C-alpha cells in the first residue's frame, strides 16, 4: 500500500516581497503544485494522499481562492484527505464548514474533521489529529495514541505541529511528544506519522517512520527554509515494513545571497553570479552585502 504525504499548501498565501505580476504567478504555482502532487501519486501507484494541515493560509479567504483550490483537487487522480491545522483550524469560522466549501467539495476530497481512527481501505486506518483552535492546550497526538491497540491494522497518524525534540520549549503545551509516538511505533499500534507545520522535509527521530514532508512550494528564504518543494511517497507493506521516497514538485526558489563587496571587481562578480541564476522568473534573491566601497 502506497500513499503520498504532503502538507502546508497554505493556499491563498501572499508574500510581501512579491510585486507586480510575481504574486499572481506565485499563487498559480502553489495551485499547480497540487496538480503535480496528483501526477506523482498516480505515477507511483499511490492509493490516496494525506495533506497534514494548513491546506489554506487562513479561514478568511476570497471565495475565488477556495473554488480554484477545490477545482484543482478535483483533478487529482486519488482520494485526498485534508487535515485542519493552525492556519485553518476547525473553529466557528472554519473554511471547511463554509457553504462554498461544502457545495463545491469534490467526491474525492475528504476532511479529517473528527479526531481518531478512519478506515481508508480494509486493514488501513488514518489516525486523524485535527486542530480545533489556533492554540491547543495539550498534546493532541498523545491523546489519540493513548490506548490504541496493536491489532494488525496498519495505521498512519496524520498530524500537525511541532515536536518536542526539535523545539524543546516548555511554554508550548501542544508540542508533540516524540517518546509517546515512538512507544506507539515500537508496540505496533502505529506504523507511520505524517506531519505538517515544518516547511522543510525533515525526518524526526531515528525510527524512519516520523516525517515532515515540508511544503510542496517554497514559502521562505533558504536560510530559514532549507529543504522545501518535496512530497513523500510512503510504501507500507502488509508486514509493516516501510520505505519513504522524496519527489521534487516545487518550482520557485527564495534565495539569500551573501556577498562581500570592496571594489569594482566584487561588484562585477556579483552581477555575474546574479546573471547565472536559472529560472529567473521563479527565483527571488535577497542580497546581504558586506564590505566597504568608496563614494567616488
Predicted regions and their residues:
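Glycine-rich, Lys/Arg-enriched anion-binding loops that position phosphate/diphosphate groups
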Residues: 200, 204-209, 213-226, 230-266
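Core dinuclear metal-dependent hydrolase active-site scaffold
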Residues: 1-3, 125-131, 234
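Short, well-ordered beta-to-alpha junction loops that form the rim of enzyme active sites
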Residues: 53, 159-162, 289-292
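His/Asp/Glu-rich metal-coordinating catalytic cores
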Residues: 48, 59-211, 215-220
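N-terminal active-site segment of His-dependent metallophosphoesterases
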Residues: 1-68, 146
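Glycine-rich phosphate/diphosphate-binding loops that line cofactor/substrate pockets in enzymes
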Residues: 40-46, 75, 151, 278-280
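Accessory, non-catalytic peripheral segments of nucleic-acid enzymes
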Residues: 32, 43, 236-296
Amino acid at each position: 500500500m502506497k500513499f503520498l504525504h504532503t502538507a502546508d499548501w497554505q493556499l491563498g498565501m501572499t508574500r510581501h516581497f512579491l510585486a507586480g505580476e510575481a504574486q499572481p504567478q506565485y499563487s498559480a504555482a502553489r495551485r499547480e503544485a497540487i496538480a503535480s502532487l496528483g501526477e506523482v501519486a498516480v505515477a507511483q501507484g499511490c492509493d490516496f494522499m494525506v495533506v497534514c494541515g494548513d491546506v489554506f493560509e487562513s479561514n478568511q479567504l476570497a471565495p475565488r481562492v477556495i473554488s480554484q483550490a477545490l477545482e484543482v483537487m478535483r483533478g487529482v487522480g486519488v482520494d485526498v484527505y485534508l487535515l485542519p491545522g493552525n492556519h485553518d483550524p476547525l473553529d466557528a469560522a472554519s473554511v471547511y464548514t463554509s457553504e462554498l466549501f461544502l457545495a463545491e467539495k469534490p467526491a474525492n476530497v475528504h476532511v479529517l474533521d473528527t479526531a481518531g481512527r478512519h478506515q481508508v481501505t480494509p486493514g488501513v486506518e488514518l489516525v486523524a489529529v485535527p486542530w480545533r483552535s489556533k492554540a491547543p492546550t495539550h498534546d493532541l497526538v498523545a491523546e489519540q495514541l493513548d490506548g490504541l491497540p496493536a491489532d494488525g491494522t496498519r495505521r498512519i497518524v496524520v498530524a500537525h505541529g511541532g515536536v518536542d525534540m526539535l523545539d524543546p520549549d516548555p511554554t508550548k503545551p501542544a508540542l508533540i511528544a516524540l517518546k509517546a509516538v515512538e512507544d506507539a511505533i515500537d508496540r505496533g499500534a502505529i506504523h507511520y506519522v505524517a506531519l505538517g507545520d515544518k516547511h522543510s522535509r525533515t525526518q524526526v527521530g531515528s525510527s524512519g517512520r516520523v516525517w515532515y514532508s515540508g511544503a510542496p512550494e517554497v514559502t521562505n528564504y533558504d536560510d530559514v527554509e532549507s529543504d522545501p518543494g518535496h512530497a513523500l511517497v510512503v510504501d507500507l507493506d502488509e508486514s509493516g515494513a516501510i520505505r519513504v521516497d522524496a519527489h521534487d514538485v516545487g518550482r520557485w526558489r527564495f534565495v539569500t545571497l551573501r556577498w562581500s563587496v570592496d571594489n569594482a571587481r566584487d561588484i562585477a562578480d556579483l552581477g555575474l553570479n546574479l546573471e547565472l541564476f536559472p529560472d529567473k522568473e521563479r527565483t527571488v534573491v535577497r542580497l546581504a552585502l558586506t564590505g566597504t566601497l568608496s563614494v567616488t
